[in-house]
Amino acid sequence: MGKALIIGCGGVASVAIHKCCQNSEAFEEICIASRTKSKCDALKEKLEGTTKTKIQTAQVDANNVDELIALIEKFNPDVVLNLALPYQDLTIRDACLATKTHYIDTANYEPEDTAKFEYKWQWAYREKFKEAGITALLGSGFDPGVTGVFSAYALKHEFDEINYIDILDCNGGDHGYPFATNFNPEINIREVSANGSYWEDGHWVETKPMEIKREYDFDGVGMKDMYLLHHEEIESLALNMPGIKRIRFFMTFGQSYLTHLKCLENVGMTSIEPIMYEGKEIVPLQFLKAVLPDPASLGPRTVGKTNIGCIFQGKKDGKEKKYYLYNICDHQECYKEVGSQAISYTTGVPAMIGAMLVMNGTWQKPGVYNIEEFDPDPFMDALNKWGLPWKESWDPALVD
């Protein structure tokens, strides 16, 4: 039994909070905190009476370290689950350090004025967290998150050495809009409009956005076009997987999405450079986010499935081997359970699991760690229990 402070009240946070309330044996009490307290109150009202978990709410500016410290000291949680924006990772980390509270997030830090995410800012906290005697668990979503757990599990149970990892993220869902993003539009568009990259033979290979395209036949979804992107777990897996030669990340996109994205880029709407408009400074991408559908509203209208997983190639007992670990998630089943589409569900469930494992001591050690640095077995068991069952194949089609 423990207490968790959950910062954020968007689509992913809503799922994680639902799952914490389903898991009241672990989460005795939670506090939902966001800049907009009314959203937290509405979620509390929806969940109270359905759970034994006690729910509090609070208003907090996640950019303000002093406010965060005051809230942590008032609520006194065992863990802080950061489901706010990636720009706010470091202020929340600083508050956890000041209060000696364990920290979990789902995405790595990204400066608001630079569309570039990497782990160096968070890894810089290693000694500070170690000295404070607290744990920071980085990237406890699906990708990053479950993909790292899958990698650790494959290395522990299936391989002596993993040489190649292809991470495949397929969303076969249809929300009916000409253009919408399945998670925070600002973060999503920054990610897909950046240069791609992959890790090969000890160094980064950079590509133009959407330059490398492949087709893959996904179980439960069918044949889809997918594109190579830069993704954060590549950076940590390159360090933590001994013998690794190449890691790539592919994500599926439909032609309508890509056409709209290119058009928006061409007219400057994906820019993060501030402009003056009627005497006020605005960021075009943030304005675009305001006019696009809220990802949290897509649940009731999204149909289809996701398929996210990792294809591994390596050696076992001196012989070449391949292995595929993946999860299939149904958008409408997610909506029936927690009122969300599957993109938020596949991130929110692992966020709850990571917080649970840190809180109950299973994954506790002082310092800053990526998810693949812990024993994967408890997490893999919890995925099956809490709504993200995984599948295996020992003869998958490979990506060229």
Where are the regions a protein language model picked out?
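Conserved N-terminal Rossmann-fold NAD(P)-binding element of oxidoreductases
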Residues: 4-11
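Short beta-strand element of Class I
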Residues: 29-31
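Helix N-cap at the beta1-alpha1 junction of Rossmann-like dinucleotide-binding domains, i.e.
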Residues: 36-39
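Rossmann-fold cofactor-recognition segment
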Residues: 49-64
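Conserved Rossmann-fold cofactor-binding substructure of NAD(P)-dependent oxidoreductases
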Residues: 61-77, 88
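N-terminal Rossmann-like NAD(P) cofactor-binding module of classical short-chain dehydrogenase/reductase
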Residues: 72, 78-82, 96, 103-104
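Rossmann-fold NAD(P)-binding glycine/threonine-rich loop
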Residues: 107-134
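C-terminal catalytic/substrate-binding lobe primarily of soluble NAD(P)-dependent oxidoreductases
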Residues: 156-400
